[in-house]
Amino acid sequence: MCDPTRDDGSSRSRVVSTMQKRAYFQRQWPLVDVVRASVVVIVHFLCLLAPFNFKWEALRFGLVLFALTTLSITFSFHRNLSHRSFKIPKWLEYPWAYSAVFALQGDPMDWVSIHRFHHQFTDSDRDPHSPKEGLLFSHILWIFDTQYIKYKCGGRDNVLDLKKQWFYKFLRRTIAVHILMFWTILYLYGGLPYLTCGGGVGIFIGYHVTWLVNSACHIWGSRSWNTKDTSRNVWWLSLFTMGESWHNNHHAFESSARQGLEWWQIDITWYLIRLFEVLGIATDVKLPSELQKQKMALVR
């Protein structure tokens, strides 16, 4: 088999051939894919049970869970760890990364590796969640085919910076323990209402909000920048995604800590980063220069 990390023509043709012939549900499913699919199915099942176990208190908890875990994903996994768009002390970096684990989107190494591959191979045959393979694939199905991702992108050698840190190695080994403990405590505290209206609804919203950035934000919306991909700005998702849906902005200036580049573009994650910068906690906060903006601007 050819090395999937190479960019020569033979590698690319093999990937395209595999895409055309791949039978999604008839393939062999390794344990990691079965676990991932099971978790997603359970979350959706709990969400369906929510109306039968409804409590306002539990629903409020679910909305808070969604907001905190989604903000943790965008602040920590995405802008801090994936793109290094700002620096914060480890005493702040690690708690935010730990909080993001409870969004049930994987450990930091896994999430960051996938996202870095997405930017390296955006919209190509080797993009982990390429829109070229369909809306459903880019939205959710890619999550359950780790062997396909490995074949397209190669190993996780793009997160060596995280592999060197004990905390992220520890989280990778023990993530299941932390998640099971959290859901056990949730049930012991609030019973089925907190499992369904709380955890189920909260994680369900967080899932689809995140996945819409991968799918919808490469199909619908407006473009402000001349990027060599299909990224779009989707304004109506900006509040729910904590600013991540200004996706054309993001692909134009990947290392920018701010994605809502206009004053009217809601970007809650940026507001948090800016707060830490004002307090002197966040440093080396990266923003696009006016010259960079001029070079990337679409000719109107």
Swiss-Prot record:
Q: What is this protein called?
A: Delta-9 desaturase-like 4 protein
Q: In which residues does the motif Histidine box-2 occur?
A: 115-119
User: What family does the Swiss-Prot or TrEMBL record give for this protein?
Assistant: Belongs to the fatty acid desaturase type 1 family.
Keywords from the named record: Endoplasmic reticulum, Fatty acid biosynthesis, Fatty acid metabolism, Iron, Lipid biosynthesis, Lipid metabolism, Membrane, Oxidoreductase, Transmembrane, Transmembrane helix
Q: What is its EC number?
A: 1.14.19.-
Question: Which organism's genome codes for this protein?
Answer: Arabidopsis thaliana (Mouse-ear cress)
User: What stretches pass through the bilayer?
Assistant: 39-59, 61-81, 175-195, 200-220
Ranges spanned by the short sequence motif Histidine box-3, renumbered to the chain: 247-251
This protein's cofactor list reads: Fe cation
